[in-house]
Design a protein with these regions (language model features):
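Serine-dependent carboxylesterase/thioesterase catalytic core
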Residues: 1-91, 164-174, 181-183
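C-terminal catalytic-base region of ester-bond hydrolases, centering on the histidine
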Residues: 69-184
Length: 184
């Protein structure tokens, strides 16, 4: 019995995984989970149009906590075309879904299906897509129980588009900052 092949990639690993799709036959990879992928949306879209890409299901995990890194990526890595944007803001392809892990509606939906992920506690983090409590358990469910997590259901129930860039950084703090607290 042949086991399904899945890919989990973080940051630039997503670009490597997507670049490999052109060399693979249809059906070679079942699910790809991209954790705050450092890749242009246009390049991801093109990779998902290859024979292997068309048969894979792509989960674009993002968070506005990664905004600074996406901004730097767009300034330091040559874009495929003028105005190209990093994939963290989402992109529309039939076999892909974007999940924003700093979106309360997304976290509520996932929790309702049994994947409880902690709310973000940082404004800037390139690693929260796998260090935040609950994320690794969710990815395990995506890969080991795909029937419980159909891509089409996620596409239909998750907010799209994701929040605008810098929305997390510019958000007012939910707790008073220590320097502004009254002392006795």
């Amino acid at each position: 019995m042949q086991r399904p092949i899945h890919i989990i990639a973080h940051s630039l690993g997503t670009a490597v995984a997507l670049d490999a799709m052109v060399h693979l036959p249809a059906g070679a990879v079942q699910r790809i989970i991209s954790l705050t992928g450092a890749c242009y949306a246009a390049e991801a879209r093109a990779a998902l149009q290859t024979p292997a890409g068309k048969t894979a299901q792509f989960f674009n995990i993002s968070s506005r906590e990664n905004d600074l890194f996406e901004f730097l990526f767009e300034r330091l890595v040559r874009p495929p075309s003028r105005g190209a944007r990093a994939m963290g803001r989402g992109f529309d392809v039939e076999n892909a879904v974007s999940l924003s892990l700093d979106c309360p509606e997304t976290l509520d939906f996932l929790a309702g299906k049994g994947a409880v992920i902690d709310a973000p506690d940082r404004r800037i983090s390139h690693w929260s897509s796998y260090t935040r409590p609950g994320t690794l358990g969710f990815y395990n469910q995506l890969l080991r129980r795909p029937a419980d997590w159909p891509l089409e259901q996620l596409r239909a129930n998750l907010p799209h588009p994701v929040a605008e860039r810098w929305s997390r950084i510019l958000e007012r703090p939910s707790v008073p900052l220590p320097s502004f607290q009254k002392t006795a």
